[in-house]
Amino acid sequence: MNTKELIAAEIAKVVPELEQENIQNLLEIPKNADMGDLAFPAFSLAKVLRKAPQMIAADIAEKIDASNFEKVEAVGPYINIFLDKSKISADVLGQVIAQGSHYADQNIGNGRNIAFDMSSPNIAKPFSIGHLRSTVIADALANIVAKQGYKPVRINHLGDWGKQFGMLIVAYKKWGSEEAVKANPINELLQLYVRINAEAEEDPSVDEEAREWFRKLEAGDEEATALWQWFRDESLVEFNRLYDELGVSFDSYNGEAFYNDKMDEVVDILTKKGLLQESQGAQVVNLEKYGIEHPALIKKSDGATLYITRDLAAALYRKRTYDFAKAIYVVGNEQSAHFKQLKAVLKEMGYNWSDDMTHVAFGLVTKNGKKLSTRKGNVILLEPTIAEAVNRAQAQIEAKNPNLPNKEAIAHAVGVGAIKFYDLKTDRMNGYDFDLDAMVSFEGETGPYVQYAHARIQSILRKADFTPSADATYSLNDVESWEIIKLLQDFPRIINRASDNFEPSIVAKFAISLAQAFNKYYAHTRILDESPERDSRLALCYATATVLKEALRLLGVEAPDEM
């Protein structure tokens, strides 16, 4: 029970007219610390109790059980509550020390599955910064729900099917060289893709030729299938190397092609339920009753299936395979209309579990304010970006700590962590402008800043040769340590807020606040000086490092012990 819950519970005993949750929502943090740690305004009770707010405040202050608090006093219409800092700090530090990285673990999920549709790069195209957002947001959310007791299922829904393969086959047959592709597969395939798109803008017949090759691929043509498989295999080797660098793994790589033989069932169900209508030769599902203006296009007039048909097949397969409690689609904001249609069609098919599906959208990454585009060759590739971030991290580590052992491994953790953290600290619906200098900086609200705070604490603990005892009681009541204690106590609530809002930035911002609070404490407090509080101060350091490391782990970022 956190302090707000504790206060609300005590006030509710005195004022049964208000729900405990309402009381909790009304609690305020006074602007002046002399007015207490939290305050409850009595205005909302005036009408119900037919008394002046000042009298109500005085009544509550007199009747409330103050044994859990330092003191409770009425000031005008407010009940000001002063928390017992020594008692709370002892409780919080005791919990963190006893539970370690399991502090804030919960069993809300009770082992149920949550399926994450994530990353989903396109085969034969390089992995760009644009794909990073889906990958790291979903991976962080998967870690967060695992901490709540759910079992995340990470599904990489590869973009391994579609007209773009027709384009690529046309380009390869026109200009491609097997040796060039084998020597540098992704880069060579990208050049071919950009070149054929430029030609298609000038010559509409290229589009028709690409469509024809894709139709052959759908029909199982031997040459088309062999080229497609080769492009896919080469791309996956490259992608997996990058996923290893990012520290991200998947439970399934079933992409679009996996559902080729599973779409007929979708069309059959829609037909049997009388949901398909003809529109200009195409087969559609009308969704006007859901407030969706455009019908869902299931089959084109030439008989080709569409993206939504494939996603319907995928949803059915995943429900049967994983029996998910929730299915989370971490996909860009521009796909929001598609996911509204997807859920509505499933609802029409009679699958009420579609209510458990959520599109977790996110904003775009730009460069100098401009949208990135693989087709136009305006793209920031992830592999060279990681290499540059690691180099910059290593240069800063060399300057700060030239004799540090394992410099390369630590630079990798800092460089990769910097890129991931910068993405995750941004509210996901906001885009951000790519700025490697800002990402890798050790100052400001960055991953390296948080990692450095953790490494600094580990250095203090090594100097002191301190390991907390599970039997000891550690308590503090000074202002600087209290700021840290409040944050540590809030960590379980942070986890739940991040999960409820599908918002990893809540955890990232918490980590920044905790690092800032510790750095302020470090500047004001002589931690290692001999004094009665020394062990409690070191216990605070230990607890802070534990929670910082766990917050970073949830974000998929390493916390080196030295930097």
Swiss-Prot record:
BP GO annotations: arginyl-tRNA aminoacylation
Reactions accelerated catalytically: tRNA(Arg) + L-arginine + ATP = L-arginyl-tRNA(Arg) + AMP + diphosphate
Entry's EC annotation: 6.1.1.19
Chief subcellular location: cytoplasm
InterPro entries: Arg-tRNA-ligase, Arg-tRNA-synth_N, Arg-tRNA-synth_N_sf, ArgRS_core, DALR_anticod-bd, Rossmann-like_a/b/a_fold, tRNAsynth_Ia_anticodon-bd
Keyword Lyase: no
Top EC category: ligase
Keywords assigned: Aminoacyl-tRNA synthetase, ATP-binding, Cytoplasm, Ligase, Nucleotide-binding, Protein biosynthesis
'HIGH' region, short sequence motif: residues: 121-131
Subcellular location: Cytoplasm
Listed GO CC annotations: cytoplasm
Keyword Cytoplasm belongs to the record: yes
One GO MF term attached to the UniProt entry: ATP binding
SUPFAM superfamilies: Anticodon-binding domain of a subclass of class I aminoacyl-tRNA synthetases, Arginyl-tRNA synthetase (ArgRS), N-terminal 'additional' domain, Nucleotidylyl transferase
Subunit record text: Monomer.
Protein family per UniProt: Belongs to the class-I aminoacyl-tRNA synthetase family.
Protein known as: Arginine--tRNA ligase
Gene name for this UniProt entry: argS
